[in-house]
Amino acid sequence: MAKENVCIVYGGKSAEHDVSILTAQNVLNAIDKEQYQIDIIYITNDGAWKKKENIVDTINDIDSLRLIDVEAGEISKLLSQGSTGNAYSAVFPLLHGPNGEDGTIQGLFEVLDIPYVGNGVLAASSSMDKLVMKQLFAHRGLPQLPYVSFLRSEYHKYEGNILKLVHDKLEYPVFVKPANLGSSVGISKCNNEEELKNGIEEAFQFDRKLVIEQGIEAREIEVAVLGNDYPETTWPGEVIKEVAFYDYKAKYKDGKIKLDIPADLDEEVQMTLRNMAVEAFKATDCAGLLRADFFVTDDNQIFINETNAMPGFTAFSMYPSLWENMGVSYSDLIKKLIELAKEKHEDKKQNKYKID
């Protein structure tokens, strides 16, 4: 049986560039190379596209994925066919943050009519933008913590009024977040006005829009979702932190987190979380995969925090670990995602693009 052509795309013009490379290393070492002919495309921090074909060896040196000695190519040509000369069965974008997880590259794949793993333009973009995401959750009736959002230009013009709004609506501690970044990049926990001002300036280095959320004493619970029109969910897992704030450094550099899978919760609470994860999946019209993040208080109040349309696949990542607990191996999970991409593309072919 001939191998299917699959292309892994990673890197990207994003502050989460290095996380994407780490994710790509994990996926490349787990994907079934007996079933798939693997090509890779690395997008540099400057936006250049570099391609290497027929990856068969284990990737031990992560820096080799930066393809330093490879010349940049023309995007449409790089994506037009695989190393076997056939079109790709699917492209797997392992891109985190802006210019990759936000609907931009999904739009490119749509225009080129290439099957791709994961969410479409709408779901990717709305899951990336924390404010839009919150508005969609509110429309779906999902419970959330209070928040305030504003633009960089508004803050520079009306700083006093905005700080007053934050103090009127929220209580310390609060979390300041860039609206369009993940992996906890640019996020600050603030306990007073001085920290708030510093956190706002930090967040505005990464985005023109930010969200300030009410802090809460609660457990951080996550649910993985997999599927297209009829998604399945996992039992919830819990993020156990050795630090007060689960930031980028704690996540990816210090390893100061532990995953408790399944989470120690009442079954009724677990089922509520799973149902809410499906509601979040549908609220943003997702396809393929999603990770839904929640807060659960000691008295079992549940608040949805956010969703991640392209969860990490690193050795520390919750998403593949949750599915492994459900009996789905890492390699099989990748296979399922590729099959879902093909299914989504076949479904799209039923659409008419002209009027008879």
UniProtKB/Swiss-Prot annotation:
Q: How the cofactor binds, per note?
A: Binds 2 magnesium or manganese ions per subunit.
Which residue numbers delimit the ATP-grasp domain? 134-339
State its cofactor: Mg(2+); Mn(2+)
Source organism lineage? Bacteria, Bacillati, Bacillota, Bacilli, Bacillales
Give the originating organism. Staphylococcus saprophyticus subsp. saprophyticus (strain ATCC 15305 / DSM 20229 / NCIMB 8711 / NCTC 7292 / S-41)
- Residues making up the signal peptide according to the UniProt record: none
- Entry similarity comment: Belongs to the D-alanine--D-alanine ligase family.
Name of the featured protein: D-alanine--D-alanine ligase
Pathway given in the UniProt record: Cell wall biogenesis; peptidoglycan biosynthesis
Q: Where in the cell is it found?
A: Cytoplasm
Free-text function comment from the UniProt entry:
Cell wall formation.
